[in-house]
């Protein structure tokens, strides 16, 4: 078990110590009603994932937000392992930014972890007045005790990759993290590595471009991102822009968990590849493609070629395995990254997707598969959509997946998700030899929610996980 520490702060002293942490018993995830036809607020669902519990694989609590159409998306913590050395800090609030509403909800999960309650609403008007930004995305806690939230837009819905700073105790908006006028042209995700005085951020598109759906013409017009921005962590300014070759729509970005590491990976959604970024011999930063998922030639789809669409990536806490989801093709892959320059495919599992046998799409040419995969049926339910958000247990032995990307894109690419709701699945991981296997006893069907089918998104464990915690 992890070392007990009576005078320590939240989280764990090291990533390897975190791997010894307790098994997850509950999971928090936002559920979205925007674009579904149900006039109800988004809510935070609490799911029981303890196999010994009589409520295993069930939603045990729902916390509705006070407004409609927020489009809750990602979440983070008031504090995490970056504050491990501060015994005055406690991980007890979940930060929930609204991608469309630009509000931030602070949820108390410390008083009663199995029944969270709303602690504070930070109105969009306050954020707009102090920061001149909109469309909030990734939230990370900082060693300073502050919370930082990335943005995608300005007040007119144009691109603006800024970072909102919140006080980690009062949750007052303090302003923006970056120097005045030094926001990136577009934003999305970010990760920092203070030992090397660096932060990296990615770009999706301006809110005006992505909010109502995906238009291929916008790609041709250069309206989607293809860059990584490298920031000076102490000076709060961009010091390098990495223009990726064949790196369209870089979304989730992760440094290795080892705080001394000078490399990491980014998943490029549309070009369906994984690129490695690293500090080079000259002391600046470079990027190279290390994994490519080939597109499939198809008939009966919106385009003649279908990309995998890599929408989420994770690194195990020991930095041994990289996982990613191909939302359109329908598979999750596990790569051994013992040699980060040459990842090796170690496991793969299909969990639905757009190319299943008997569906509307016919695959004409496939560089990887000899036949179209069978539809996935769990507990008698055919799974709509494809795997999207993924979360790994601390010990690396269980992977959880949900199937919703973003309500407007769900409606466009997987209309079944709107009618039937999204699903939450669990995959068992072989951490010795590699390999992924579905747990047939686990399914959370968000199509059966009390107010109608909902779109469940990113997953969080109460004690932190491999995409929320950063070690310094």
UniProtKB/Swiss-Prot annotation:
<comment type="pathway">
    <text>Organosulfur degradation.</text>
</comment>
<feature type="modified residue" description="Phosphoserine">
    <location>
        <position position="111"/>
    </location>
</feature>
<comment type="similarity">
    <text>Belongs to the selenium-binding protein family.</text>
</comment>
<dbReference type="GO" id="GO:0015031">
    <property type="term" value="P:protein transport"/>
</dbReference>
<dbReference type="GO" id="GO:0018549">
    <property type="term" value="F:methanethiol oxidase activity"/>
</dbReference>
<keyword id="KW-0963">Cytoplasm</keyword>
<dbReference type="GO" id="GO:0016020">
    <property type="term" value="C:membrane"/>
</dbReference>
<keyword id="KW-0539">Nucleus</keyword>
<keyword id="KW-0597">Phosphoprotein</keyword>
<protein>
    <recommendedName>
        <fullName>Methanethiol oxidase</fullName>
        <ecNumber>1.8.3.4</ecNumber>
    </recommendedName>
</protein>
<dbReference type="GO" id="GO:0050873">
    <property type="term" value="P:brown fat cell differentiation"/>
</dbReference>
<dbReference type="GO" id="GO:0005634">
    <property type="term" value="C:nucleus"/>
</dbReference>
<dbReference type="Pfam" id="PF05694">
    <property type="entry name" value="SBP56"/>
</dbReference>
<dbReference type="InterPro" id="IPR008826">
    <property type="entry name" value="Se-bd"/>
</dbReference>
<keyword id="KW-0711">Selenium</keyword>
<feature type="modified residue" description="Phosphoserine">
    <location>
        <position position="467"/>
    </location>
</feature>
<dbReference type="GO" id="GO:0005829">
    <property type="term" value="C:cytosol"/>
</dbReference>
<dbReference type="GO" id="GO:0008430">
    <property type="term" value="F:selenium binding"/>
</dbReference>
<keyword id="KW-0813">Transport</keyword>
<comment type="subunit">
    <text>Interacts with USP33.</text>
</comment>
<keyword id="KW-0560">Oxidoreductase</keyword>
<comment type="function">
    <text>Catalyzes the oxidation of methanethiol, an organosulfur compound known to be produced in substantial amounts by gut bacteria. Selenium-binding protein which may be involved in the sensing of reactive xenobiotics in the cytoplasm. May be involved in intra-Golgi protein transport.</text>
</comment>
<keyword id="KW-0472">Membrane</keyword>
<keyword id="KW-0007">Acetylation</keyword>
<feature type="modified residue" description="N-acetylalanine">
    <location>
        <position position="2"/>
    </location>
</feature>
<keyword id="KW-0653">Protein transport</keyword>
